[in-house]
Amino acid sequence: MELGSSDVTSSGLDHAGLNSLGLPKPPALTRVVVAMSGGVDSSVVAALLKREGYEVIGVTLQLYDHGEAVHRKGACCAGQDIQDARQVADQLGIPHYVLDYEERFRRKVIDPFAQSYATGETPIPCVSCNSEIKFADLFETAQHLGADVLATGHYVSSKAEADGGRALYRSLDSSRDQSYFLFATTNAQLELLRFPLGDLAKPDVRQMARQLGLVVADKADSQDICFVPSGKYSDVIERLSPGAVVPGEILHVDGRVLGRHSGVIHYTIGQRRGLGLGAVGAGAGEPLYVIRLDAAKAQVIVGPRQALATRRVHLRGVNWIGPGSLQDMDEHGLEIFVQVRSTRAPIPGFLHAHESEIWVDFALDEDGVSPGQACVFYENDQPRARVLGGGFISATESALQMREMFPKPPNEDLLDTNESSDLVSPKRSAC
């Protein structure tokens, strides 16, 4: 049940005896910890819950050395954001705590991000931040505070199912849906999580903030990865893993050496501009894209756009939160919809599981696939679709037969493009 439901009586309970958070007691007896980032969304969540009579406690996480990020727009969990969260809490008259999670954030999020990027992957730190920090460590803190539930400002929904558990769903506002970043949420975590904004559109939330008089009502939305103040991921990698930056060759998929690079961390799979190759190519005016990054050999492999097409992805770290279990899957696979980039809509595909191997076959060619990114499973491609889980892409298989494109390649090893890509650097959506 969503906040403000017309089924809720004056007592704060619906006709089934549940409050708007699905708990069997009045709001005044329900303690809710709200993860307050200092942004509009989580501030509105805290304000709405307070207005409905819940006992609200605000908690803000200090996740990194935020000194250089104070007053910097487009980030979260920075110095100014902590001040904004505190100011909103003061407005609402609720307790507010700031927790220093810098060490664990570096250990669980920043260091793995740097290691993954150095291997030629395109990692998503927001997934591990949610699953390892917000929905794990913060959970423990919420329980220590005696909270009944933990509420966040994510644009997703969770609903009670007939079997007594809770399921995760995409938000009503597809343009703001954040379920891609929450696929690693476990069933146990869903039991205690609440997402009050799941059935609201962002313009409505911002209008609510203005009506509530919140000081952050017109604050800009977060866009960047919070711990990359300059917006350059390579700066973080060079600082944390200086030995990982090794110069090498830029090769065409047909084996020709086209130039040299100063480190694979400066390239993104699917990148077209800034390759430093001038007008070279297999043919006159042929656009070249980064097809594969081989960090072990310090090679950047480029080729035509057609080489980016992918039909199969192999997965690691799979989390299943759908009905039943993966072990019960039919040998022909499960027909689902999958999302391989945060900025694209889900596409049809088939999920397969055999022994320890899990993979997805796309029904259509997909160009925007990069190892390290997530492949998230959905029941359908509509708003409010149920999230079935997901995993991290470990490798992909090309939709093209490379040997047909290049019948006599000088170096067949280069054509084994088991890591495919995106046409442009994947946009980093806020998590």
Swiss-Prot record:
NCBIfam families: PRK00143.1, trmU. Disulfide bonds join C129-C226. ATP binds at A35, M36, S37, G38, G39, V40, D41, S42, L61, G153. GO terms for molecular function: ATP binding; tRNA binding; tRNA-uridine 2-sulfurtransferase activity. This is tRNA-specific 2-thiouridylase MnmA. Residues 176-178 are annotated as: Interaction with tRNA. One of its GO terms (cellular component) is cytoplasm. It catalyses: S-sulfanyl-L-cysteinyl-[protein] + uridine(34) in tRNA + AH2 + ATP = 2-thiouridine(34) in tRNA + L-cysteinyl-[protein] + A + AMP + diphosphate + H(+). Residues 407-431 are annotated as: Disordered. Keywords: ATP-binding, Cytoplasm, Disulfide bond, Nucleotide-binding, RNA-binding, Transferase, tRNA processing, tRNA-binding. The active site is at C129, C226. Belongs to the MnmA/TRMU family. GO terms for biological process: tRNA wobble position uridine thiolation. Catalyzes the 2-thiolation of uridine at the wobble position (U34) of tRNA, leading to the formation of s(2)U34. InterPro entries: MnmA-like, MnmA-like_C, MnmA-like_central, MnmA-like_central_sf, Rossmann-like_a/b/a_fold. Its EC number is 2.8.1.13. The record marks H154, Q373 as: Interaction with tRNA. Gene3D superfamilies: Adenine nucleotide alpha hydrolases-like domains, HUPs, Translation factors. Its main location: cytoplasm. It is found in: Cytoplasm.
